[in-house]
Amino acid sequence: MQEIKNIREFDEIIAHDKVLVYFYVPWNNSSLSVGEILEEEKDNLSEYEMVKVNLDRILSLTRIYHITTVPDIKIFERGKITKDILGIKTKNELFKELNK
């Protein structure tokens, strides 16, 4: 999964169709667990362009997108948030939320 390095790169990527953005911090165990689930399931999530954002490196995105909890998964389509998924702990929960 590609890691976004800066806001300019982030803005370019989310302008695409169906982008799954995984917001995390490396010191949070829940964040790391969800990251592992996404990596394991990437073939089953191939309809999405998947990227990750380390919020310790791009802290301003927490204000822009009102991120108060990690991990946070947002689905963007052409720059607009179409889904916000919080509190995922298992792959079943992830797919249930994605299929709503």
PLM regions: where:
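CheY-like receiver
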Residues: 12-13, 61, 97
